């Protein structure tokens, strides 16, 4: 979107999963977009692309989960950035439902190995914020005996920095939306 209101549309990837939300963050002097890709065999891994000097980079895979599903999971990734430090959180289910987190120290050009945030009774609908101290706080929807809760947990590059905490009860229906975190300070 230009200051004059013109929209310059560009196709980043022709195989973006149509129903999963995308997310965007500013990393240094570039925009970083994350999304769920959809290969010819319906493998739905998370990809990242940067808008640098007016052109989109070739997308990179955040992690090859190799989740194959012949339907849209309606469960896209989340990204947060501070300069070249980037955190991406996502839901995946190649063998069981999981929430994962990966860090990048080069603005999303490459990503480290994923950290396991949660597994088992997770629904997904993730969000992430990146704090000044480098910790990423991940939130997700988890199934309970009585419905669902929104959970949040801080992580550093080595793993969990504290325990997961239930933030609020929630409805499991898709119509309840996707919980979002807002960083107020720090």
What are these regions (language model features)?
Residues 1-186:
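Extracellular, repeat-based ectodomains that mediate carbohydrate processing or recognition
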């Amino acid at each position: 979107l230009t200051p004059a209101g013109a929209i310059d549309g560009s196709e980043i990837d022709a195989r973006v999963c149509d129903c999963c939300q995308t997310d965007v963050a500013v990393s240094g002097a570039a925009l970083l977009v994350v999304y769920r890709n959809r290969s010819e065999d319906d493998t739905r891994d998370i990809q990242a692309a940067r808008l640098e000097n007016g052109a989109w980079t070739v997308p990179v895979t955040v992690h090859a989960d190799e989740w194959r599903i012949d339907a849209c999971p309606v469960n896209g990734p989340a990204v947060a950035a501070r300069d070249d430090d980037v955190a991406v959180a996502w839901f995946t289910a190649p063998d069981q439902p999981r929430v994962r987190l990966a860090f990048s120290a080069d603005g999303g050009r490459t990503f480290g190995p994923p950290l396991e945030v949660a597994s088992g009774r997770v629904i997904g609908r993730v969000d992430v914020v990146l704090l000044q101290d480098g910790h990423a706080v991940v939130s997700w929807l988890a199934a309970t005996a009585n419905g669902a809760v929104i959970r949040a947990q801080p992580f550093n590059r080595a793993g969990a920095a504290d325990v997961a905490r239930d933030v609020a009860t929630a409805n499991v229906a898709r119509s309840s939306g996707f919980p979002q975190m807002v960083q107020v300070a720090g």
